[in-house]
From Swiss-Prot:
Transmembrane segments: none annotated. The lineage of its organism: Eukaryota, Metazoa, Ecdysozoa, Arthropoda, Chelicerata. Belongs to the neurotoxin 19 (CSTX) family. 10 (U11-Lctx) subfamily. This is U11-lycotoxin-Ls1d. Residues 1-20 form the signal peptide. Contains 4 disulfide bonds. It comes from Lycosa singoriensis (Wolf spider).
Amino acid sequence: MKLIIFTGLVLFAIVSLIEAEEESGRGCILLYGECTKATDSCCSNLICDCYRKLEKGVQIARQCFCSEKDVIYKKDI
């Protein structure tokens, strides 16, 4: 009986440690991933670029994406 309780406690501790590690060290957001709600979560070699979506001159949304540092994107018409 003691062995079963001990085994259960050990398994619970292992699962708790794994969950805590996932929360504290969540993976960074990769290239072109959306970072609107977490602007500081892009991987170390990326930055979070934000864009305003306008409709008839009025902002209706804001979207952010992880992109490469020192890279400028231009609209190709």
